[in-house]
Each structure stands twice: as C-alpha cells, then as structure tokens.
C-alpha cells in the first residue's frame, strides 16, 4: 500500500478533498489493485481505536454496577461528534436564510419599490455567498461524521472479537454464529453512514422553529396549515412504512424457504445431477418464488406510494399555506415565491431528515445495548496450574455443560450482597444438579504418570471430548479436583486449518526448530504430500484448508499438536479421516515413538490402540465404565472385549464407525446388566446420534461438522423467550440473517420426545440476514446452533475493586503483538481471505442496460409510455405559456381586491407563469401517483427480476460440474440471495426515483428556457460538466466499492475461522496473534472504505460547486436582463434553487442505479454459463390433477413393461480419462475394464487415490475422454439424463433437502403412496417414518436433522430401489453407521439389487467380501483387477492392509475349526424385527 497524500495535504486540500485526485486519476485510466490503495491514518488503525475504547469500557466496568457502553463511546468520541454537529447546523441555517434574500430580490422589482432596485445586485451576491458557505460547511461536517461512525464501528468490531476469544464455552454454547455475525454486520453498519443523520434529531426542531417564525412573518397563522399537512404526511408515511414492514416480514419467511432449498441444491449439486433431479428442484424453487413475488409486489407498491408522497407534497404544502392568507387578506407575489422556498426546506426537514434521524437513534441505541449485553457475558477462566507437577490426576470430577443451579445461586448471591446463604444451602443446591440437567461427566477418577499413554474410549456422547475440555479448562468442574502442569498441546477431533501456509499451521507461533519440524513432518506422513506442491510447505491454504483433503488436514492438525513442546498432549480422535495403512504408520511412528517420553491422552476406539495404551478409561453416558490396563479389561469385562473383537475386522473401522459399535456394545453390556430396554429408553437411544444433549451441546459453535450452508428463519417460541437469546428484546417477528447452519440435529430437538416436538420442527430455524450475502464464509464447515436454552440471563458481577492503575496495567501485561505484526504479509492475507475477483467491468456497460431492458418486451413499452406522457406534459405547458404570452392583459380596473382593500392580490401576466411552473414541476409527479406511469414501471421491473431468476436457476442446474467446481458455494448463493434481493427491492424503485427526478429537472429547465433563453445557454455547459464528472468519478468509485466489498469478507471469515479453532487457539495461547490478524483485516477494509468515503465527498462537493457557479450565472443573468417583471425573476430564481437540489439528488440516484446494475451484470454472467453436453429432450408430463407442469419432468423408462435399456447391467469401460477442468491434469488415466451383468465390483485404494472420482466419471460429472458402454449402448449415443438414469446412486455425502418424506423419496411424484410404503418397508424405513406426525407428509428441515446418518443412508437406498436402476454405485455407504443399520443395508442390497450390477467403494472389509472382483486404483491408474483370492496371494495394497489374523477371519468357511471361539457378526441377525427397528430408533 502507498503512503496517503492526506498526511502531507494542506488545509485547503483537506477542505476540498483535493488529496484524492491521484487515486481518481489512476482509477479512471486503469484498473485499481490493492497495492494502489492508500494506507490508513494512524488514528484510524484498529489497534489504536480498540485500545482507546477498551480502556474506557474497562473503566466503566470498574466504576459502576450497571456499566453503559454508550458512556465509554461518549468519552471517546463525543466532542468531535458535537463539533461536526454544530457545523452541520450552521450549514442547515443557511438554507433558512436564503429565501429571505430571494424575497428581497423579488421585492426590488416591485413597481412601488424602485429605490431598492439598485441593491438587487448586492442581494444576488449575498445569495450566492450563502450557497458557497453552505457548501464549505456541510461537506466537511458530513465527512467528519461518517469518519467518526467508521471509527466507532472499528473499535466495537475489535472489542467484540476480543470478547469472543475470551468467552467461556458455556456461553459460546448458547450463542449462535448468526448472532455474532449479526452483531458485526447488521448492527454495526448502522454507525458508518447513519451517524451523519443523528444530529437532525435536534437540528430539525430548531430549523422548523426558525422557518415557522419566518413564514409567520409572511403569512401569519395560515403558515401552520402547511406544517400541519407535513406532519399528517409524515404520519401517513410512517403508517405506510409499518405496512411495508408487515409485508416484508411475511415475505422474509418465503425468501428463507427458497434460499434453504437453493443452498441445499448448491451444496449438493453433484447429487442433484446424479439423481437427475434438475427439473424437480427447478420446479420446487420456482413455486416458492411465485409465492414470494406476490408479497414482493405488495411491498413494492406500498414503498412506491411512500416515495411518491414526498414528490407530490410540495404543491399542497405551498397551496395550503398560501390559500387561507390569500382568501382573507390577499397576497403579493413576493410572498408566494418566498413561501415556496421556505416550504421546500421545511418539507425535506419534516418528511425526510427527522424520521431518518429518529430511526438512526433507535437503531444505534438498540445495537449499542446488544453489544453491551454481549460484552458482559461470562469469560473463559484459565485454571491454576502447578508447573512442577509431572502427573495428571482427576479426583471425583463432575461437570455440566449447562450451568448448574448451584452456580446460578452463587451468581445471584454475588449480585445481592444483602442476601446471606449458609454452606448447608450450598450443599443442597449442588446435590440437586440432577434435577436440572444430566452431568456430561460424573465422578471421574484417574491418574497417569509422566510418559504414560491413556486411551479414552466410549460411545458417541459418552463425554470423551468433554474430558479433554475439562483438562484444558474449557469446561469448569462442578465438583472434584484436577491436577496437571498446564503445559498442554491439543489436537481437535475436527481438523482445523488457519489461513496461512502449511509451515505456519504446524509451527503455529512456536519458535522454529528445523530438526524437530522435519521429525514431526516424517512422523505424521506429510513429507510425500508436501513434495507434491510446487511451493512445498509454503503453499498458502485458504479458509478451512480448502485445498487439502480431509486426511491431509487431520495430519497437519496432529503435526501442529506434536510440534509444540508440552508436558501433556491431548489427542481427540486424530485418526478419524485416515485410511488403515496411514493410521497404523502414524500411530507407531508418532504417538508411540516420537512422543514416547510425553504424557498422552488419546481418544480412540481402535482395539490396537487400547492394547498399546498404559491405561484405558472407558466412558459410558458420562460415567467411568472401566479404568485400568488392557489385561485388566479382558479379565474384568470379558463380555465387553470379546464382543468388540467379535466384529469382523473391527480394527479396520474408522473412528466414527467404531464409535457406533461401542455405542451398541455398551448399551448391551452396561453396568446395570442385560436388562431389557424399555420402549421409552429405546426411543431415547434412537436419536442419540443426532440429538445427544450433553456431549454434543458444546459443538454449537466450537466444533462444526459437515459443511452444509443454509439460510434459516426462526419464530421465537416460548421456550426460546425464556432462554439466553441475543435478540430476546425484539418483538415476535421473522428476521432474516445469514447463518451457516448444520446438517446435524443436536439443537433442533429439545430434550423431550420427538413425537411432541414434531409439529414444531417445520420452519423453526435460526434466524438469518441478507447483509451477510456479500461475505465468504461459505467454504468452511458449518456451525450448530441452539434453540432450547432455558437458563436465565445473569450478568457478571461488576469489578468494583478494580482501580484505574489496575486497568492500565492489565492492558500492558497482555502479550504484545509487535513481533506478530511482522509475521503477517498483506499479500498472504489477500490470498487467504479474499473471494475470487469479479471479472465484470468497473462501470456497468450500455450492453447490460440494453440487455436488461429487452429481457421483457413490456418494459420497452412502459418506458416509451413514460416518455410519451412526459412529452405531452411539456407540450401542454408550452402551449399554455404561449397562449398566455399572446393574450392581452386584463384591464387594471378588473383587478380584484380583498374586502378590506388593505392588501391587493397582484395579478400580472408574468405571475400567471407561476401556475404553470407548478404544473410542469409538480404535475409530472401527480400523474406518477396514478397508475399512468409509476406502478406499471415498478410492476414490470419486478417481472424482469422474476425472469432473470428463472433463467439463472436453470443455467446453474444445467451447468457442468467443471464450471461449478470453480465457483464457491457462497458466491453462487449470493447471486440468488443478495443480487436477486437487489433486483426485487432496490432496483425498481431506484430506477423510478431516477426517472422521476430527471423528468422534474428537465421540466423545470424547459420552463426557465422559455422565460429566459440566456439561462438555457448557461445550462448546456453545466449538464456537459455533470456528465463528464460523473463518468470520471464512477470509474474509480465502483472499483473502490468492489475492493471494499472484497475487503469486508476477510473480517467475517476470520471470525468464523477463529471460532472453529477456538479451543486450539487457547490451548496454544495464540489469541494475541489472531487479534493482530483480525486488526490487519480490519485495517485493509478501513483503507478501502475511508478512500471511498473521501472520493465520494470529493464528487459531491464538485457537483455542488458546479451548481453554485450555475446559480451565480442564473442570478446575475436574471437580475441584469429582466425588465420590470418581478414574477419572471421569482420563477427563475426559485426554479434554479429547486433544480440545484433536485439535480444533485438525480446525480446520486444515477450512481445508485449504476451500482445496483452491477448485480444485473453478475446475474447475466451466471445466465451465460456453459451447459452440459447432451442436454436431454424434455417432455411435459401431466400431473394427477390433469394440469400441465411448467417444469418438465423426466419419465423413468425403467418402469415400462417393455423395458429395453438397460436390461442386464453389463458395463464396459475403454480408455477412460477424467479431468476436473478441460485443460487440467488428468485425475484418472486410461481406465479400462468390463463388468458382467449382476456382478459386484469393489474399488480399493488409498485415501485420495480416485475411487470416488471414478464413480463421478461414470455419471459424466467430470470432463471425460474415452468410452463407456452399458449393455452395448455407448454414452455418446444417448442424452445425458438418459445415461444417468441407468444408475442408482448412494453418495458419500447424503442429500436430504427441506421437504416432506414423500418429496425426498419421489420428487417427481411418479409413485403412489402404496409403492413408497412398500419400498420403505423393504429398506427398514417404515417404522422410522411412522414415528413422525404426518408420516410421509412430515417436513424434514436442516438436512433431515431429526434422522441419524444411518436413516439418511436408508433414504438414499430407498431412492435407488424406486428408480429400478440396473447399475448401483455406492460411495462409502456404511460410513458413520451403527451395526444394525449396516446389516439392513447389506440385506437390502442382497434382496432388492440381487440382479443389479453393483460397484462399491468401501473401507469396511466385511462389506467387500461379497464382491466378486476388485479394482485396485493407485496413482490415477488401474493397478489390478482381480478376484479377492488373487489379491491376497500377491503383494498387493489390499494384502498390506490385512493382518494375518484378519485374513483368517475373511474366510471362516475355510477355517471353521480355528474360528469356533470367535463370535460372528451374523449373531445380530438373530434379533427380532422389532428389536432391530427399536435399536435403529
């Protein structure tokens, strides 16, 4: 970045903003880059501003029981805020004084007042000077207030972020990511531009009092008639505003429903294409869009009337003010013109400035109160450690993620010093914890010496992660004692990658040691992966490590933990994403050898790890099921260990699958014995995978899983109203905000039966905001959210004993960020955070306007109609002016007088022109109030938006995956949310306002030109100057706005990234580093925003200067060239003043239109995306009600009796090569093999070898070369949809969209209920569906969060059965499944797909046993294609993964005598069907 010219600018340069000329010149000539932006002034740096506000806030916390954030802000910014407010007031006062001078100028032309004619020129000079003074006062004042608003936002941004890093895990558990994003986006944005309006709360009353005093002098009591009308108008507009909000609130829910489905479609676009659901999804979204547009039109019409009310009110204000006075006393022309000028100022003040100011204060105070509540939430407390301790001890520890009643009691006791409570009462409260919630850990005891390995095992939700959190201090124990040294390193269960290089992610701020670094890289098997990158370990990873596979991310996270030299290493399921071979090697080389002398606590379910551990701790439902060595486990719990070892190849399972088996085993062999499980308990067990309330609750914000991004809306339930909810003070209404929601269902179900909560699940979702649609959080994993927090909101006790010296010393004692700032490179920041640069022009091209206008032919006719009406108005005006000009004046004797004859109503020929000034200037807007022009325009523009949305949706659904893979999901979603919202809401009314203002100006200029042709000559260069200046400014401003928008996303991305890795950050003590990184992102955004504000003010000031010159010319031309006509001078000067304000408004509207049209450009860019080859011919399919569907439906050829293709499922692959992009490197090369009909083929290979890619290539989802034939039919000879319908698919990423069970199983509505129930029965889904109210009509939300992963897999299986496909592709179908659900899938595959060809990608060994052939993929090529016997006889990858003992298990029929003592997994089949269903539920 360059040094800012502002630092060396003179006072004059600062006053006129001339220091921005270099950037304006550069932006006009070439495209601006980040390096062209000026550095921010030191006073605007986030470090300085946050330090200043934090110091004042700490003082406020220390000095008062009820600290107020507004007091801290007042001490920081008040005097500058008031200084600019006074400047603003003085500038507004000049507006009130100008009409006085105008009246004196008109009076000087009075035939009876000729002595004042000589001073008219001096009055003209005074009037011009007032305009100059106003310009010099207003613009610095407005810029100064914007600047202060920006500084307040920066300071509060930083304060919120720092507080977020300090929040306790319990508080984070109760706050959704949406609320944090709302704090940073919705609320704080109000300060930036809103602060300039805040002063009008006191300026407008003073201004109205001054104006009414001046009008009183002219018109006496009748002046209040006009004021009364304005007040009524303001109230009318407020009523319209409330009506508009009502429609918008109703519409918000509909928008949300559409965006939920759209986001699910975008996230699962590969599955949508694999299922051939493009038309079904398009129809579903378009139906929701139709309902949404009905409410959009209503809101737009109300807003249209609200906007028009301002335009037409001018005439009535003047008319109502003047008419009573004229009827009673008569009036002179001077008073009419002076009143007009006063009323223009009065109208703006009462109907615009004051309501805006009140709204600004309301919004700002509400935002400050929300932030204040957030800043007082409970902070994370680090435990006191003994650095000399070498052992880890836990004695009788019990802990709750929920606050216990005893803790609430302690807080209440602190807040009420008068209340005394005995120790007996404390014991009573602590003993009643169980009444309020289940402890996540209870009565845990263990002790491990230095250098020992403790393996922690247990079922999902048993409390394994909570145990590690308690050791780290994230979870406070309610009872018991924890003892360790405090030097901890931590590896999270969900691998977390910070933005930066691989090396920075591993070192993570620790001093660099080359030998240690290389040792860790080798031990974690990262050397081979790093060598593949051109930049080696200096390759920059984006947010969430999106360039890496899951296994690579897991190994980097593990390497980070191992690299840090600590006494205690906490490893939370670090091997979950690794294949069998890699897991074995890393466990041996890293955990057992490299860390042999360190104390380690490893969360695992792998039997091999349990055998090698020094101690084993098995948890079950928060309690210690077993603690001891592995030999003791075998002796004390032989049933447990034999049961685990009885599962075929249990050691080969991933961590998640082993967890599922442990869950089942612990349930059967619990401490209570083998008592039968009641139906209620079984049902509770059924949702344990997705609804566990203890262990999983903390995941709401700290440990996100499954990257599905959705928008959601929630209506507050009574349960939420009682809970800790950030927005609990807001009325019960729908609010929109952007929030990444989760696929998991922990938080959607309260801790009661699903039956009772079923009806409330529909559309009860966390609120979400459209402002965040400009941010790039889309690629990260999503965050869980809470809906059932039921504890009271209790604030922290004030720190009354903290002195100012303590506060300051606390600031100094924190780790400084000076050395950290050197580590952060701005180019790295750009690579880490920024979205893809938009390749659209800086200024909207004429081609975009032309294309937009021609989208709908009606729009062209409407615009022509608008122009015809305007020309008719101008023509009528000119005809009447000509008629009056050629009509002889009335005889003086016919002049009318009032009854008392004291005041004459002067009627002259020129005064009659005033009537037509009103007609030309105002009649245009009066007609707009009717249905002649405005409403058809708004209506048609919304129709254009509807067409563009439909075209874009169709284009995205038909685009090839190679194109979609280059786009971020959030970027696509922004087009459907942010840009479509602009097309629906802002663009139609902005275009209407611009056309309206433009026609008013042209009409006024036409009248002036007729009255005084010389002034028309002066108008031409002004218009030319305006067009040139606008073009010059627009080129730079739009680029700056784009850079500012790109610079905003890193702030929110960094927030989400920090939250995902918060436990890791705290364990490594890297909060100061991330605060500095956050400040860097803030400073980058500030640099762009400050420059945009400065250049905008430069432009506004230049426009005003041009108009001041124009007004000077008009004034002197009219004074010097006009003869005796006071009416002519009055009309010209009044119109000139009106033209100045209106044309400036029109200029700003034109810039707004150009800015909003960029959204149209982005939409056109998506509409122009290429489509997939082999687009199928679509035919309409009549629905049951006989109506034709607007969306074409694909008919399934396999349901026909004369089924021709595919008949057998024979598949031949010849020289198949697959690439992600057309010119990219091949991912698979020269794959050739053939499959016989009905054969089962297993795909083998390491993680990332290309197994899933091969399945995608079969479906033609990639750029492919070569040929595939099914039953002799080549894929080139049929359409893409026909080809894909030949396959049934069970993808790795399960796709459940928001809709009914029926829609999810049969989106094209091809099957009857009986057929769907039959298939549901086959796959074991019937009992699941019957548990829900409405059964098949029950609406699933949040990706089917009320279903376990196994149930979702069964849904996919049911879809494949319904499709009657001949070839079935299965990509990890058993991932995350419990044994019972897995057995059901195996049984269904055998029965329903007995005659089908099955291609299986699976890590479970026993699943592969049923395959006749195996395809081994290595280094992008087929290495082997043989039977399992041949693979085991050779030195193959498959053989390496199988231990000798496992090979014995693979062939029990050959080694029956050796296997008699081994329990078989077939034992599960002995259960009755009821037991199977109950276990699944």
From Swiss-Prot:
- Show where the ABC transporter domain sits: 423-646, 1211-1444
Residues recorded as binding ATP, renumbered to this chain, are 458-465, 1245-1252
Which source organism?
A: Macaca fascicularis (Crab-eating macaque)
* Highest taxon above the source species: Eukaryota
Catalysed conversion reaction: ATP + H2O + closed Cl(-) channel = ADP + phosphate + open Cl(-) channel; chloride(in) = chloride(out); hydrogencarbonate(in) = hydrogencarbonate(out); ATP + H2O = ADP + phosphate + H(+)
Spell out the family assignment given in the record's similarity comment: Belongs to the ABC transporter superfamily. ABCC family. CFTR transporter (TC 3.A.1.202) subfamily.
Q: Sorted alphabetically, which keywords does the UniProt record give?
A: ATP-binding, Cell membrane, Chloride, Chloride channel, Endoplasmic reticulum, Endosome, Glycoprotein, Ion channel, Ion transport, Isomerase, Isopeptide bond, Lipoprotein, Membrane, Nucleotide-binding, Nucleus, Palmitate, Phosphoprotein, Repeat, Transmembrane, Transmembrane helix, Transport, Ubl conjugation
**Lipidated residue numbers (S-palmitoyl cysteine):** 524, 1396
This chain belongs to the protein called: Cystic fibrosis transmembrane conductance regulator
Q: Which amino acid positions bind ATP 1, per UniProt?
A: 401, 434, 458-465, 493
- Mind listing the GO biological process terms from this record? bicarbonate transport; cellular response to cAMP; cellular response to forskolin; chloride transmembrane transport; intracellular pH elevation; membrane hyperpolarization; multicellular organismal-level water homeostasis; response to endoplasmic reticulum stress
Where is the chain membrane-spanning? 78-98, 123-146, 196-216, 223-243, 299-319, 340-358, 859-879, 919-939, 991-1011, 1014-1034, 1096-1116, 1131-1151
Q: Which residues bind ATP 2?
A: 1220, 1245-1252
């Amino acid at each position: 970045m360059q040094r800012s010219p502002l630092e060396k600018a003179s006072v004059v340069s600062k006053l006129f903003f001339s220091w921005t000329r270099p950037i304006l010149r550069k932006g006009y000539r070439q495209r601006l880059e980040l390096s062209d932006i000026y550095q921010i002034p030191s006073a605007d740096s986030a470090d300085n501003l946050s330090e200043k506000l934090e110091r004042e806030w700490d003082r406020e916390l220390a000095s008062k029981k009820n600290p107020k954030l507004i007091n801290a802000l007042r001490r920081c910014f008040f005097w500058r805020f008031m200084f600019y407010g006074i400047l603003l007031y003085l500038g507004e006062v000049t507006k009130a004084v100008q009409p006085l001078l105008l009246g004196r100028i008109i009076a000087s032309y009075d035939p009876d007042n000729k002595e004042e004619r000589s001073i008219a020129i001096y009055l003209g000079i005074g009037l011009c000077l007032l305009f100059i003074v106003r310009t010099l006062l207003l613009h610095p004042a407005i810029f100064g207030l914007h600047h202060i608003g920006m500084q307040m936002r920066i300071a509060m941004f930083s304060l919120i972020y720092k507080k977020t890093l300090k929040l306790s895990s319990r508080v984070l558990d109760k706050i959704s990511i949406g609320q944090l994003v709302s704090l940073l986006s919705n609320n704080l944005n109000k300060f930036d531009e809103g602060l300039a309006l805040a002063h009008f709360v006191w300026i407008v009353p003073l201004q109205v009092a001054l104006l009414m005093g001046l009008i009183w002098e002219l018109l006496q009591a009748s002046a209040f008639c006009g004021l009364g009308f304005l007040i009524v108008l303001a109230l009318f507009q407020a009523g319209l505003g409330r009506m508009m909000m009502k429609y918008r609130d109703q519409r918000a829910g509909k928008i949300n429903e559409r965006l939920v489905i759209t986001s699910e479609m975008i996230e699962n676009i590969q599955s949508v294409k694999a299922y051939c659901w493009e038309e079904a999804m398009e129809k579903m979204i378009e139906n929701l869009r139709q309902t949404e547009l009905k409410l959009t039109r209503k809101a737009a019409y109300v807003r249209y009337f609200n906007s028009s009310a301002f335009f037409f009110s001018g005439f009535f204000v003047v008319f109502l003010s003047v008419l009573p006075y004229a009827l009673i006393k008569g009036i002179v022309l001077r008073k009419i013109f002076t009143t007009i000028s006063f009323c223009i100022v009065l109208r703006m003040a009462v109907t615009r400035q004051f309501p805006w100011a009140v709204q600004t204060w309301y919004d700002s105070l509400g935002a400050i109160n929300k932030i204040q509540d957030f800043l007082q939430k409970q902070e994370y407390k680090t435990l006191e450690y003994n650095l000399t301790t070498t052992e880890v001890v836990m004695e009788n520890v019990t802990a709750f993620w929920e606050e216990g009643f005893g803790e609430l009691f302690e807080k209440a006791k602190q807040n009420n010093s008068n209340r005394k409570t005995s120790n007996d009462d404390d014991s009573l409260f602590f003993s009643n914890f169980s009444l309020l919630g289940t402890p996540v850990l209870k009565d845990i005891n263990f002790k491990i010496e230095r250098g020992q390995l403790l393996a922690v095992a247990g079922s999902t939700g048993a409390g394994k992660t909570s145990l590690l959190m308690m050791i780290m201090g994230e979870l406070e124990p309610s009872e018991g004692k924890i003892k360790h040294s405090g030097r901890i390193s931590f590896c999270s269960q969900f691998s977390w990658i910070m933005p930066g290089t691989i090396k920075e992610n591993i070192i993570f701020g620790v001093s660099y040691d080359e030998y240690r670094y290389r040792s860790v890289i080798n031990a974690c098997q990262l050397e081979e992966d790093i060598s593949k990158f051109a930049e080696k370990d200096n390759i920059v990873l984006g947010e969430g490590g999106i360039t890496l596979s899951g296994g690579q991310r897991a190994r980097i996270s593990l390497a980070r933990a191992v690299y840090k030299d600590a006494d205690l290493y906490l490893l939370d399921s670090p091997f979950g994403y690794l294949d069998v071979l890699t897991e074995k090697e890393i466990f041996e080389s890293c955990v057992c050898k490299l860390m042999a002398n360190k104390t380690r606590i490893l969360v695992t379910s792998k039997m091999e790890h349990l055998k090698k551990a020094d101690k084993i701790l098995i948890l079950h439902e928060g309690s210690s099921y077993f603690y001891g060595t592995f030999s003791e486990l075998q002796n004390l719990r032989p049933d447990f260990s034999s049961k685990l070892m009885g599962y075929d190849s249990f050691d080969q399972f991933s961590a998640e699958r082993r967890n599922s088996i442990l869950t089942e085993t612990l349930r059967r062999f619990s401490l209570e014995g083998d008592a039968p499980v009641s139906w209620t308990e079984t049902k509770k067990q059924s949702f344990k995978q997705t609804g566990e309330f203890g262990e999983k609750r903390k995941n709401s914000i700290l440990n996100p899983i499954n990257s599905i991004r959705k928008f959601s809306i929630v209506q507050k339930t009574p349960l939420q109203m009682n809970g800790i909810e950030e927005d609990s003070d807001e009325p019960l209404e729908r609010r929109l905000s952007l929030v990444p929601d989760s696929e998991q269902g922990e938080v959607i179900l309260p801790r009661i039966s699903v039956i009772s909560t079923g009806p409330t699940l529909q559309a009860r979702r966390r609120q979400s905001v459209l402002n965040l649609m400009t941010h790039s959080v889309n690629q990260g994993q999503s965050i869980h959210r809470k809906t059932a927090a039921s504890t009271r909101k209790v604030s922290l006790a004030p720190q009354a004993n903290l002195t100012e010296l303590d506060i300051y010393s606390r600031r100094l004692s924190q780790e400084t960020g000076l050395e950290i700032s050197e580590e952060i490179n701005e180019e790295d920041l750009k690579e880490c955070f920024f979205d893809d640069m938009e390749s659209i022009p800086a200024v909207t091209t004429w081609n975009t306007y032309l294309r937009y206008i021609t989208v709908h032919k009606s729009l062209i006719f409407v615009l022509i109609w608008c122009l015809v009406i305007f020309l008719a108005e101008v023509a009528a005006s000119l005809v009447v002016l000509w008629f009056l000009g050629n009509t002889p004046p009335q005889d003086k004797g016919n002049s009318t007088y009032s009854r008392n004859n004291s005041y004459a109503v002067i009627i002259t020929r020129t005064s009659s022109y005033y009537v037509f000034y009103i007609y030309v200037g105002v009649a245009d807007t009066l007609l707009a109030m009717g249905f002649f022009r405005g409403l058809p325009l708004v209506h048609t523009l919304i129709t254009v938006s509807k067409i563009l949305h439909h075209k874009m949706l169709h284009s995205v659904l038909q685009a090839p995956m190679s194109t979609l893979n280059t786009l971020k999901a959030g970027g696509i979603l922004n087009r459907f949310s942010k840009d479509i919202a602009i097309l629906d809401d802002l663009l139609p009314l902005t275009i209407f306002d611009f056309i309206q203002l433009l026609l008013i100006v042209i009409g006024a200029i036409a009248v002036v030109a007729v009255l005084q042709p010389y002034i028309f000559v002066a108008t031409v260069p002004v218009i030319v100057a305006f067009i040139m200046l606008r073009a010059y400014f627009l080129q730079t401003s739009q680029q700056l706005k784009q850079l500012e928008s790109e610079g905003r996303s890193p702030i929110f991305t960094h927030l989400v990234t920090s939250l995902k890795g918060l436990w890791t950050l705290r364990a490594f003590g890297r909060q100061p580093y991330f605060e500095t990184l956050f400040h860097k992102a803030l400073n980058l955004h500030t640099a762009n925003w400050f420059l945009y504000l400065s250049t905008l003010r430069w432009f506004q000031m230049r426009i005003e200067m041009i108009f001041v010159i124009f007004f000077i010319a008009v004034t002197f031309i009219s004074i010097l060239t006009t003869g005796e006509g006071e009416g002519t001078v009055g009309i010209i000067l009044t119109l000139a003043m009106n033209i100045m304000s209106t044309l400036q408004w029109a200029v700003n509207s034109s810039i707004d239109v150009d800015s909003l049209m960029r959204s149209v450009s982005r939409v056109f860019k998506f509409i122009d995306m290429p489509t997939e080859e082999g687009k199928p011919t679509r035919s309409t399919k009549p629905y049951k009600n006989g109506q034709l569907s607007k969306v074409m439906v694909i008919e399934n050829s396999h349901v026909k009796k004369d089924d021709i293709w595919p008949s057998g499922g024979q598949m031949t692959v010849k020289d198949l090569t697959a690439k992600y992009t057309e010119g990219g490197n091949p991912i698979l090369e020269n794959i050739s093999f053939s499959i016989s009909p009905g054969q089962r083929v297993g795909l083998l290979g390491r993680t990332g070898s290309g197994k899933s890619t091969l399945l995608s290539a079969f479906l033609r989802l990639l750029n492919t070369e070569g040929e595939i034939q099914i039953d002799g039919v080549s894929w080139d000879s049929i359409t893409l949809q026909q080809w894909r319908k030949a396959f049934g698919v069970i993808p790795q990423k399960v796709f459940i969209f928001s809709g009914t069970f029926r829609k999810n199983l049969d989106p094209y509505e091809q099957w009857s209920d009986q057929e769907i129930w039959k298939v549901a029965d086959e796959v074991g889904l019937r009992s699941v569906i019957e548990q829900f109210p409405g059964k098949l009509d029950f609406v699933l939300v949040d990706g089917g969060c009320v279903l376990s992963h196994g149930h979702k897999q069964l849904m996919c299986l049911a879809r494949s059965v319904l499709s009657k496909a001949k070839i079935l592709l299965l990509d990890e179908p058993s991932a995350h499944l419990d044994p019972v659900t897995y057995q059901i899938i195996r049984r269904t595959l055998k029965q329903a797909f007995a005659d089908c060809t099955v291609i299986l990608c699976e890590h479970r060994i026993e699943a592969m046993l049923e395959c006749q052939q195996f395809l081994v993929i290595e280094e992008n090529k087929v290495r082997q294609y043989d039977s399992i016997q041949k693979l085991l006889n050779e030195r193959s990858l498959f053989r390496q993964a199988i231990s000798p003992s496992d090979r014995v298990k693979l062939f029990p029929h050959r080694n029956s005598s050796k296997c008699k003592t081994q329990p078989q997994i077939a034992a599960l089949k002995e259960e009755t069907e009821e037991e199977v269903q109950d276990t699944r539920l």
